[in-house]
Amino acid sequence: MFDSTARTRTAVLATTGALAAVVTALGVTGPASAAEGSTGTAVTTTVVDPNDALLRASQMPVVNDVQDWSRVATRHSRVSTAQPESLSALGFSDKARRDFAMPGGRATNVVLTFADAAAAADAYAEVKAWRQHTGDNIPAGGQLLFTDKVKPVTVQQGRGSYFSFVFKSDKSSDEGTFEWVGVTRRGSAVSIVDWRVNGADATYDVDPTIASVQAANIKLARVS
């Protein structure tokens, strides 16, 4: 059903050689920092998802087998660092959100439903265009290091894609943040999968965002 022709590659939180070079230059090769996204005593999210359209923790991307997401209380922050304005600007009719965390990482899945497929298609294009804003919300004193191109994802029905970028919250830090934004549209619904990690390295055959975007697309059949 899905494209399985991707080549095996070794990467340090990377989908391209260029991104790997950025990470090598950073010296970010140690274990993930617990500073951001630590689960601590987080409360389970209370978001209502009657159609089971949101991804489970096990369906969210990870870069190795020892990483494990935990659901946390729903955040009210941006879905992505690259998000230029409130999600309400996308014009959705309904929204469900689920947030996750692990030591050194955080992730979010949002499902948006729209009045019709045309409105959903416009929103899908807008989320892809977040790539133009990867440096907009980096903290003062930080630095955008790399933004990858938007890559298509073969999905069951509709459209899917993702992009990644790397930034430092503090230019003097030896550690960077690596973030991926995946999005898929099916009928009149859109699902956004965003995840970010600090200071981890991994070897994988295909970018783990791909499988999550594909799973999100399948789940959209329940609301589109």
Predicted region positions:
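Secretory targeting and sorting signals
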Residues: 1-35
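Short Gly/Thr-rich strand-loop-strand
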Residues: 44, 61-63, 67-81, 129-177, ...
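Short, well-ordered beta-strand elements
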Residues: 108-110, 184, 188-197
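Short, surface-exposed beta-strand/loop micro-motifs that present aromatic residues
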Residues: 94-99, 178-185
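Short, surface-exposed coil-to-beta transition loops
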Residues: 105-108, 174-181
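Surface-exposed amphipathic alpha-helical segments
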Residues: 196-224
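N-terminal "mature-domain start" segment
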Residues: 31-99, 223-224
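A short acidic-to-branched-hydrophobic micro-motif
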Residues: 95-128
